[in-house]
Amino acid sequence: MEDFIRFAISEGFSSYGISSHAPLPFSTAWTMEWDRMDDYLSEFARLKEKYADKIELAIGLEIDYLNEESHPAIPRFQELPLDYRIGSVHMLYSPQGKVVDIDTPADIFRQLIDAHFEGDLDYVVHLYYKNLLRMVELGGFDILGHADKMHYNASCYRPGLLDEPWYDALVRDYFAEIARHGYIVEINTKSYHDLGTFYPNERYFPLLRELGIRVQVNSDAHYPERINNSRAEALATLKKVGFDT
């Protein structure tokens, strides 16, 4: 945690937010365990005091919507003393009830869709946005993380998907619902350098502006040296469509 803060200071940040992946009902390689939560919060408190004269710090969590029992709005997450919460979807249940991680490289995504969903990409895309919409309805978070993260993998699986009318209508309805609830949408720059895409896809930036959705540029960096990656490109793209950055 301290390495991220030091790097943020060296990059000239005036404020910075720390947000680990929140615990899930099962262990993964990339989520925190509940027995580490107190350490996470106390270490942040120590660092906030240590660097108070250099940078404004905030503490949060990125919390998955998994099902009706595990999502950002449940009391266990709401009771935590956090400054902000990010809501996101990384996993889906297959028809057989298996949890499938769909936030993978595109080649692995293809294998998973074929193995667990019989190659039915339309079903997977609809399920993904259904879960996102349910998370929006339940609430309990401030920022919607990588709002259409699946778009890259899905369009690699089936090139041209983003131009299909049903997909465009699905995404537009989704953003309209986000606007109705007043959430901030993260402009996620994590993949821009390597894949040339933001999340959400920049084709929807004008819609976000039209709907009056507030946005926040985030790096989603898992390594300190990447916290400022593609920020300038994201801000320039937002400015082109009328956002005041």
Model-assigned labels for residue ranges:
Residues M1-N67, P72, F77-E79, H151-P165, ...:
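An N-terminally biased module of ancient metal coordination in phosphate/nucleic-acid-related enzymes
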Residues A8, R85, H146, V185, ...:
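Conserved, mostly hydrophobic/aromatic
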Residues S14-S15, S19, D83, D142, ...:
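Short acidic/polar active-site loop segments enriched in Thr and Asp
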Residues S19-S20, G145, V185-K190, Q216-S219:
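Short beta-strands and strand-loop turn motifs
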Residues M37-R180:
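Extended substrate/RNA-proximal surfaces in nucleic-acid metabolism proteins
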Residues K130-L133, L138, R203, A236-V241:
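C-terminal functional module detector
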Residues A169-R172, I187-V217, N229-A232:
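Extended hydrophobic/aromatic segments used for targeting, binding, or gating
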